[in-house]
């Protein structure tokens, strides 16, 4: 993006135009580049920057004066643009490498507020709101299972899966400290009375990955109950809403255009994301459908049929929302991860960078 023909030299130069990159971050980038483990990621980012520098839609071979890194920061205000970079105070760029996640929000923000007012953080226990009986039944079954297993034993293999992220691999020590002094026999009879220490104990004892075999039937019934209730709640909210605006929020389309530079399993991803005004000039919604899915965790699938106003073409955009515990089973209130299942380059309103 800043020109030059060699990535190593560009890193060594630490260009002053990158105004928000600290010396410590430059040191880390140098170390990672020398290590070679992320060679493909560095190369893809370098090539995407070069493409944006040359693109007619982008910088048109004009070296930028200011490049600001905004990634990893929660943006203030009601802003749908997931911008990681801001170039010359004008160009907004989202960096998306091998990710289908559109947003990570509170379930109420997705299903009740329809993402109006921003994507928001997590608050409250969604499971307790939408499927209290199934939630309690699962917890009761978990208690019975744990009481049949010695306190020092884990109940599932340490593999990543339901309700977990890679961050949980480093969280074990903290969980053990928080759960210290709490035994299975001390756990309350009601899931609604769990303390932070109780939840840490459950997370540690249940482990990462799939549910233990004796708990899978109860977990499946719980997941379906949550998905059914959540889908019904979402449909009720959509029935009286402006569905076009809801779709724009799901697709992160707003009043400002921006660019997506990244990679998918199909190769480089270089897109220009139009505004809501652009979208309306070209497309309209024919149908917005929501269904509960039978999965190992609560999943709600969404499917939108879109017509092109300038032709007879129609496109189906599909995705799903996983409603899952944050950082492990029972650990923290659930979050809603919105996924886009349709490839980005096929989304109406996402145009190739030229």
Enumerate the predicted regions with their spans.
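Short, positively charged
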Residues: 1-83, 87-354
């Amino acid at each position: 993006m800043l020109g030059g023909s060699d990535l190593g030299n560009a890193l060594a130069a630490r260009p002053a135009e990158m105004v928000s990159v600290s010396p410590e971050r430059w040191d880390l980038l140098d170390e990672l580049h020398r290590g070679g483990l992320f060679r493909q990621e560095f190369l893809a980012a370098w090539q995407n920057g070069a493409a944006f520098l040359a693109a007619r839609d982008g910088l048109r071979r004009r070296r930028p004066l200011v490049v600001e890194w905004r990634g990893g920061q929660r943006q203030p205000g009601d802003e749908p643009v997931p911008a990681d970079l801001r170039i010359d105070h004008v160009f907004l760029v989202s960096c998306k490498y091998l990710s289908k996640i559109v947003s990570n929000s509170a379930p109420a923000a997705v299903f009740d507020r329809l993402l109006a007012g921003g994507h928001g953080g997590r608050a409250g226990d969604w499971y307790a709101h939408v499927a209290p009986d199934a939630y309690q039944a699962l917890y009761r079954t978990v208690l019975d299972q744990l009481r049949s297993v010695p306190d020092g034993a884990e109940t599932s293999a340490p593999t990543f899966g339901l309700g977990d992220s890679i961050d949980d691999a480093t969280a074990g020590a903290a969980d053990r400290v928080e759960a210290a002094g709490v035994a299975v026999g001390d756990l309350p009879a009601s899931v609604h009375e769990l303390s932070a220490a109780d939840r840490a104990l459950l997370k540690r004892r249940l482990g990462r990955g799939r549910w233990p075999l004796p708990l899978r039937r109860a977990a499946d019934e719980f997941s379906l109950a949550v998905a059914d209730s959540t889908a019904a709640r979402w449909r009720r909210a959509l029935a009286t809403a402006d569905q076009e605006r809801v779709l724009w929020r799901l697709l992160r389309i707003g009043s400002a255009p921006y660019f997506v530079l990244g990679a998918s399993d199909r190769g480089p991803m270089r897109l220009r994301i139009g505004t809501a005004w652009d979208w309306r000039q070209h497309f309209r919604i024919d149908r917005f459908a929501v269904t509960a899915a039978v999965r190992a965790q609560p999943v709600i699938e969404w499917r939108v049929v879109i017509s092109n106003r300038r032709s007879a073409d129609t496109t189906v955009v599909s995705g799903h929302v996983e409603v899952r515990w944050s950082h492990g089973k029972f650990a923290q209130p659930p979050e809603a991860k919105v996924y886009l299942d349709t490839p980005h380059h096929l989304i109406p309103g996402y145009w190739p960078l030229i």
